[in-house]
Amino acid sequence: MITGGAYQEKKKYAVNYYGISENDMKNGKNCSISDLGNAKCIYNFQYLTKKYSIDDIKKAIFENPDIIIISDIIGEGIIPIEKSERIWRENTGKLCCWIAEKSVSVTRVSCGIGQIIKTTPVVFIRHGKTTGNLEKRYIGRTDEDLCETGKNELMKINYPECNNIVSSPLKRCIQSAEIIYPDKKIIIDENLRETDFGIFEGKNYSELCKNPDYRNWIDGKSEIPNGEISENFKKRCCNAFYNVMKNAYRKTAFIVHGGVIMAVFEKYGFPKKSFYDYQVSNGRGFIADFDGKYLKIREKI
């Protein structure tokens, strides 16, 4: 959500920050409720409350959670004499408060400069250690349990409280989530599983160092034979993260794999860093803020 006074270049800010064009925008003065359900962006949003009920507008927004809403602040200044204008102000104010609560981010724009006044907190935690991790093996699709060392280490770390818990479908992540957040419902997302290491699966460096396919892979010259293509893996993880976050307005924890964390932060992390700059140890991770475009790390776990 983007808000601010009239004539403060809120549209221009949306174009520059979110990379949308003015052709992607609908004007609340003349658009329909169906436009709200499928547009990328609505500006002059405040005028919709003159034409449609709050319940109908909320329903349309739920059907289009990716929408960017631009609304003037209309509750300031002289109180209107006309009762209908006062009711319009009141209804618009209540609706905008509801949208702000549900939004991933809220930005107030003045003179074309945006001040982010709300982000969504998010926590990333890499699963605890498995036997394969202790032996420094490539463990991707292999569905290992946590080892006792991994379980004990998780119980010693002080993790932040979270409202929503999302986990990879693999046992090492689910078991980690159950230890870290024992009283929370765990949501399983199949698209947050680790990559498939193909012919390298279950092996370690000493077993692979003389393999020419392995040398080519670590040198960035080729993909893993019979494994998941790197770009496909990254895209899968980032899409899964975004699909969760566009509906998550409360603090959300992702209990996932090291590769998943690196993939998501490579795309959304700010300032920009490379994939391997976001490596974390087992049981460790990041506390960050997501504003719909960037993940900004607040602290390390």
Task: Explain the meaning of each model-derived region.
Residues 271-296:
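Domain-level recognition of soluble alpha/beta enzyme cores
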Residues 68, 163-169, 251-255:
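Short glycine-rich phosphate-binding loop at a beta-alpha junction
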Residues 24-26, 31-70:
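Conserved nucleotide-sensing/catalytic segment adjacent to the nucleotide-binding pocket
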Residues 180-236:
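Phosphate-handling substructures
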Residues 56-62, 94, 149-163, 242:
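A short, N-terminal amphipathic alpha-helix
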